[in-house]
Amino acid sequence: MRLNGKTAVVTGGASGIGKATAEMLAEAGAHVLIGDLDETNGAAVAAAIRAKGQAADFSRLDVADLASVAAFKSAADALNLKVDIVANVAGWGKIQAFMENTPEFWRKVMDVNLLGPVAVTHAFLPGMIERNSGKVVTVSSDAGRVGSLGETVYSGAKGGAIAFTKSLAREVARYNINVNCVCPGPTDTPLLAAVPEKHREAFVKATPMRRLAKPSEIADAILFFASDRASFVTGQTISVSGGLTLAG
């Protein structure tokens, strides 16, 4: 699956699934613009990609801040990048009982996991419409399909991202723009590493394949949706979860 001549935005590209996605899209031939709050690691990922003779840039991005999203879009314009692919990978969550949540917690979860993809997509979609072509791939979660204990608001946000994907796909299909969603199961990322060991063990036990996903396995699905191999696929959600949601 080649992306030669394409330009891709990858949010959350400094680590985990986002990093794997940026590396994979660049390897496939795309010019990648990485956005992340972590400027040190984000710039390092872009530099490592360039060191392999591939094209990558980095610009700071807080998907939960509309001003930051606007500045990120301006950075893309300053680089004269005509974005063909938006990969909404940035996410945040914390296992916590719903009755222990605060309104501030709700807002952060919703702003990063739902409104972040909405804002970034809204910023780059006009160019895709103008060129009558584009791909939007949003990383949701199987929590958004079947729920997850201790992740009630997170599950709601991720479920919203799935619904956003389906509705937007209907709206922009006339412009030859594909909009799809990838739902990872528990994945070996820095975010999951912060989860207590007992919860990680429970995730593995609940997964028929009895292991965590590798970030590259999620990136594989993102690459498919971003490529011409998925030219007639839109509004779809695929779980990459080792069978965790067989009935989902």
PLM ranges: what are they?
Residues 126, 170-174, 231:
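Alpha-helical segment proximal to the catalytic Tyr-Lys
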Residues 2-33:
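Canonical Rossmann dinucleotide-binding motif of NAD(H)/NADP(H)-dependent dehydrogenases/reductases
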Residues 97-98, 102-107, 192, 203:
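Substrate-binding pocket helix/loop in short-chain dehydrogenase/reductase
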Residues 121, 157, 165:
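Active-site helix of classical SDR
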Residues 141:
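Residue(s) in the substrate-gating loop at a strand-loop-helix junction
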